[in-house]
Curated annotation (Swiss-Prot):
InterPro entries: Aminotrans_V_dom, Aminotrans_V_PyrdxlP_BS, Cys_deSase_IscS, Cysteine_dSase, PyrdxlP-dep_Trfase, PyrdxlP-dep_Trfase_major, PyrdxlP-dep_Trfase_small. Pyridoxal 5'-phosphate binds at residues 75-76, 155, 183, 203-205, 243. This is Cysteine desulfurase IscS. GO terms for biological process: [2Fe-2S] cluster assembly. It is an enzyme of class 2 (transferase).
Length: 404
């Protein structure tokens, strides 16, 4: 077993060696390096064929038509393109958008930008387990609502939203439904031929593909229209201009092909490892599970350890690569906005750790992590006067601290 142990697969994944090997064949003069938009010679044709194969691989994993897959630079761009693109195209019908407070920043900040442009956004508060109350969602839908954007799996707590039912609700009212599926693709079955989803964002690097590549699914029947956000040569059927990065697309396609083959066995293995990790931690005093295991993704475990500072715990766990909050916002010391939206107090939100497991995680690593966390929590609490007061029966929430 090599240290440090990587348990931050929700932040990014290493490229699968099969993916890296395949990508190498699309870079140099000896490989297929052409521009897929070059229609006048075989270098271009071969590159175009490689892109087509990758597009098919992605479509097969998610049950769509390959022509519905638009390549982007990542899920952040896909979220931006979906939300801004749909809002701009359908704004004559209305200017009201619905999303949730626990969405990824790529969705929330895109919605904030649209608010500055005159759109109205309703940010729903989820239930304490992270799930959206479907009755509450129905209650905020209006005649001028044009778009609902709800993620499939939350990147911090792993909760799985009922996108099937939400899709039916949106469909019945003629509202466009966008889903950020960055964390779910390859871990949960997605069948866009059955789901009433109009737009869906995907990433390459959360599923053992390369960084810098993603895709947006745009439904063809009934046709969904979006306004381009990147202008140029009209690539990707006019929705996203820019020369296609063949090596990255091939890498993403190969990653999705492998995921389709191995998903059923891998998901079971991950769920067993996640449950093993939780079973090893759950009898620590004052430990709280954020989210809900039975409604959660198989690879994410978010736990709060009361009376322990999250930052000091992460430092104590230097042999474990884990995160507090998401990587996108971990440069700030603010407690996780996702956990705050679930109603956790600052102390519990600050003491949360997200463990996310993946393809290369072993049972031995999970057992090592359990042992290390238990020892570290014990040691840090011994140093904590708050823990001592708690053990003496003092209710810390009632203490009035004097300002100085």
């Amino acid at each position: 077993m090599k240290l440090p142990i990587y348990m931050d697969y929700s932040a990014t994944t290493p490229a699968d060696p099969r993916v890296a090997e395949k990508m190498m064949q699309y870079l140099t003069l000896d490989g297929t390096f052409g521009n897929p938009a070059s229609r006048s010679h075989r270098f271009g044709w071969q590159a175009e064929e490689a892109v087509d194969v990758a597009r098919n691989n992605i479509a097969e994993l998610v049950g769509s038509d390959p022509r519905e897959i638009v390549f982007t630079s990542g899920a952040t761009e896909a979220d931006n393109l979906a939300i801004k693109g749909a809002a701009n195209f359908y704004q004559k019908k209305g200017k009201h958008i619905i999303t949730c407070k626990t969405e990824h920043k790529a969705v929330l900040d895109t919605c904030r930008q649209l608010e500055r442009e005159g759109f109205e956004v309703t940010y729903m508060t989820p239930q304490p387990n992270g799930l959206i109350d479907l009755n509450a969602l129905e209650a905020v839908m209006r005649d001028d609502t044009i778009l609902v954007s709800i993620m499939h799996v939350n990147n911090e707590i792993g909760i799985i939203q009922d996108i099937e039912t939400i899709g039916e609700m949106c469909h019945a009212r003629g509202i466009i439904f966008h889903v950020d599926a960055t964390q779910s693709v390859g871990k949960l079955p997605i069948d866009l031929s059955k789901l009433k989803v109009d737009l869906m964002s995907f990433s390459g690097h959360k599923i053992y593909g390369p960084k810098g590549i993603g895709a947006l699914y745009v439904r063809r029947k009934p046709r969904v229209r979006i306004e381009a956000q990147m202008h140029g040569g009209g690539h990707e059927r006019g929705m996203r201009s820019g020369t296609l990065p063949v090596h990255q697309i091939v890498g993403m396609g190969e990653a999705y092909r492998i995921a389709k083959e191995e998903m059923s066995t891998e998901v079971l293995r991950l769920r067993v490892l996640r449950d093993r990790l939780w079973n090893g931690l759950k009898d620590i005093e004052e430990v709280y599970l954020n989210g809900a295991l039975e409604q959660g993704a198989p690879n994410i475990l978010n736990v709060s350890f009361n009376f322990v500072e999250g930052e000091s715990l992460i430092m104590a766990l230097k042999d474990l690569a884990v995160s507090s909050g998401s990587a996108c916002t971990s440069a700030s010391l603010e407690p996780s906005y996702v956990l705050r939206a679930l109603g956790l107090n600052d102390e519990l939100a600050h003491s949360s750790i997200r463990f996310s497991l993946g393809r290369f995680t072993t049972e031995e690593e999970v057992d090592y992590a359990i042992d290390l966390v238990r020892k570290s929590i014990g040691r840090l609490r011994e140093l904590s006067p708050l823990w001592e007061m708690h053990k003496q029966g003092v209710d810390i929430s009632t203490i009035e601290w004097s300002a100085h």
